[in-house]
Amino acid sequence: MARSGRDIAKVDAYEKLDMDYQDLCDPYMLEQDEELFYGFWGSCTNSYRDTKHHKGYQILLKWRDAFRVKANANGADGTRSRFQAAFDRLKECQALPAGVGVHSVTNDPFFVYTSNVDSHFKRDFDCKEVYELHGSVETWQCAGDVETGAREPCEKIWKLPLDFRFDLDVATMKAPGAEATTCPECGGKGRPNVLMFHDRQWIANRSEENGYIAWESVMELMLQEDPTLNLVVLEIGLNNRFLPIQSKGLEALEAIDRELANLGLKA
């Protein structure tokens, strides 16, 4: 999620209000104090956009490109045809999400599964090979009536303009709403399309989710059928707060291990 509790604790404006990270990263704050809500997310968004990539992103990008080169060395057409064949078999037995087509799923042997909401991975990596499972500050959604629940969000999702910046007062950490943060469909208040605390109205990105599910399913089938292939799960920057991410890696490894065991092989 956006920022850490440690960062928030150092902000004078929040300390004076006796507010912590969970108070601010809550959709109900939009109704309680609109400018404080937009100030918090505006600070995050401005900061994320100003932050340049560290070398870790370039290392991952080089690895991705190396995987592509290796796959192409073995015959790009052959790799695509194997992916297509596995995809078609899973589609035929209805083991893939409905509406997912093979061209909407990356056939690269590489995928980024992240809880980061800064959208930095999408600066360099193909959108089809990134799943931001908690959403992103670059994408906004209609907020509906958060306080009373009297009006559900209209399900409109939109991107912030690339040249947009929040007009943040750093003394109060407040920012006004703007046209860019207003729902273009119904004119209601907007909010980041980010999963927050106590969030019942977040609109999940089913397209990204389904793309990842389809990719993982195809890769698992290819690994099951070809024991010479290897699966690597690289976890970066995880701790006990990110159990959903850790469990996803374990699920993938356990699924492959079970299938190989059934074939009398060892992972």
Question: What is the meaning of each model-derived region?
Answer:
Residues 1-267:
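Conserved catalytic alpha/beta core of Sir2/sirtuin-type deacylases, generalized to analogous enzyme cores
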